[in-house]
């Protein structure tokens, strides 16, 4: 009987040792799993179970964006408003010094911006113009044509000379298509009391070509047109003959088109 009791006691002791070893291994495994890798930098605060405190070193701008100078923008807006106000007063009054500003303001607003010259300068200095200035179909061969001999809007016979009015000529032609004599920008499409439906093109050398007595136009304001580009058409009679008006300006001065273009 005592022998059997000793055997049971030994089995219980052996079982207790096995359970004790299993718990020790389990605790060690969990501890190793919780331990961070050796390459992770652990601060003293994290070792003691507290979260690290980070200081915000970003500079403050008191609610103002560092790249936007509000004061400067407001000042420019005020100056612009004052300029517009002075211009309006100059047109509405005839008092002393203020009225003297009127001619200068009028000349400024009447002077057309040199789109063609600006584009040509930009192209010379920096290469091809910006996308919204350059025509999609323009290539290097067409760029070289700037400054070459002018072409006639439409070949024909001159009916009215430059000396008749000191501004332009009238040409009789059998072609209903009117082309641009040189590349440039359309700066005016209007209906004139003397020349009817008229297109005005500005060129890079500060010259202008004017095409009148058109039946319809194929271009719009500020369009770029190449040399030889169709601007519009004229009406032909029963004998397939039509007349168009043409003039050229160098700055503010009219020049005789016959001196620079052959129409026959």
Swiss-Prot record:
Its main location: membrane. Residues 1-10 have a biased composition (Basic and acidic residues). Pfam families: Peptidase_M23. The chain crosses the membrane at residues 73-90. Residues 1-37 are annotated as: Disordered. Residues 19-31 have a biased composition (Polar residues). Residues 91-264 are forespore intermembrane space. One of its GO terms (molecular function) is metalloendopeptidase activity. Signal peptide: none annotated. Residues 1-72 are mother cell cytoplasmic. Implicated in the coupling of mother cell to forespore gene expression. Required for spore formation at 37 degrees Celsius, but not at 30 degrees Celsius. SpoIVFA plays a central role in both maintaining the SpoIVFA/BofA/SpoIVFB complex and anchoring it to the outer forespore membrane. SpoIVFA brings BofA into close proximity to SpoIVFB, allowing BofA to inhibit SpoIVFB. Increased accumulation of SpoIVFA seems to inhibit the activity of SpoIVFB and thus regulates the activation of sigma-K. This is Stage IV sporulation protein FA. It comes from Bacillus subtilis (strain 168).
């Amino acid at each position: 009987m005592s022998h059997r009791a000793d055997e049971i006691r030994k089995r219980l002791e052996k079982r207790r040792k096995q359970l004790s070893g299993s718990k020790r291994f389990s605790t060690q495994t969990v501890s190793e799993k919780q331990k961070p890798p050796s390459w992770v930098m652990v601060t003293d605060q994290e070792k003691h179970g507290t979260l690290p405190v980070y200081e915000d070193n970003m500079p403050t701008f008191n609610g103002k964006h560092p790249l936007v100078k509000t004061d400067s923008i407001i000042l420019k807006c005020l100056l612009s408003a004052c300029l517009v106000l002075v211009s309006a007063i100059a047109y509405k009054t005839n008092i002393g010094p203020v009225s003297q500003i009127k001619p200068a303001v009028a000349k400024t607003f009447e002077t057309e911006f040199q789109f063609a010259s600006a584009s040509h300068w930009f192209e010379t200095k920096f290469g091809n113009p910006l996308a919204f200035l350059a025509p999609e179909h323009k290539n290097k061969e067409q760029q070289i044509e700037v400054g070459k001999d002018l072409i006639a809007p439409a070949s024909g016979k001159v009916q009215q000379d430059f000396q008749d009015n000191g501004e332009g000529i009238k040409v009789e032609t059998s072609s209903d298509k009117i082309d641009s004599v040189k590349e440039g920008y359309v700066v005016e499409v209007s209906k004139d009391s003397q020349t009817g439906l008229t297109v005005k093109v500005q060129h890079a050398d500060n010259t202008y070509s004017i095409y009148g007595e058109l039946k319809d136009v194929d271009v719009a304001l500020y369009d770029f047109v190449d040399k030889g580009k169709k601007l519009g058409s004229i009406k032909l009679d029963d004998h397939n003959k039509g007349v168009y008006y043409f003039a050229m300006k160098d700055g503010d001065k009219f020049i005789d088109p016959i001196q620079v273009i052959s129409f026959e």
